Amino acid sequence: MITYYVLFFIHLESRRICLAGVTRHPDQGWMEQMARNVTMEDAGFLINRRYLLHDRDRKYCSSFRQVIEAGSVQTLALPPRSPNLNAYAERWVRSVKEECLAKLILLGESSLRRALRHYEAHYHEERNHQGKDNVLLFPLPTQAVRGEPEKVRCRQRLGGLLKYYECEAA
């Protein structure tokens, strides 16, 4: 069995996820590159963000924090053994494991990346969120037909593992 490490970022207010990268060896160079990617001037996920909260894992090395701070984002290491202070990230990890990864047999890094990409889209566009009044975070624009229950269609991802039901357009 091979262990892969997934680096992701989550915007706490909107719950938007950014899958930064997947690797077998999250060394200093890889972490620095991921930090550069998310702080890029035009397309970085952390642009116009003030803080980056992270746990005290040694993977968040000083050079990673320096690159993040060079992008005008203050890094804040959470106290030890305090997962409740990072509850949204912890919940996303649990959700992706239970709803997706635990039900798949992944045959390498590319299949992991594919599953994560599909789950990220499902999480953003098709999955209701209790903490957000059971609405979709970023719904796709649709022309739903109201009052006609026979016009419901099912959209599937990952071979039917992830399902989403919506009203068909007329």
For each feature predicted by the language model, list its residue ranges.
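Charged DNA-binding/catalytic regions of mobile-element recombinases
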Residues: M1-A170
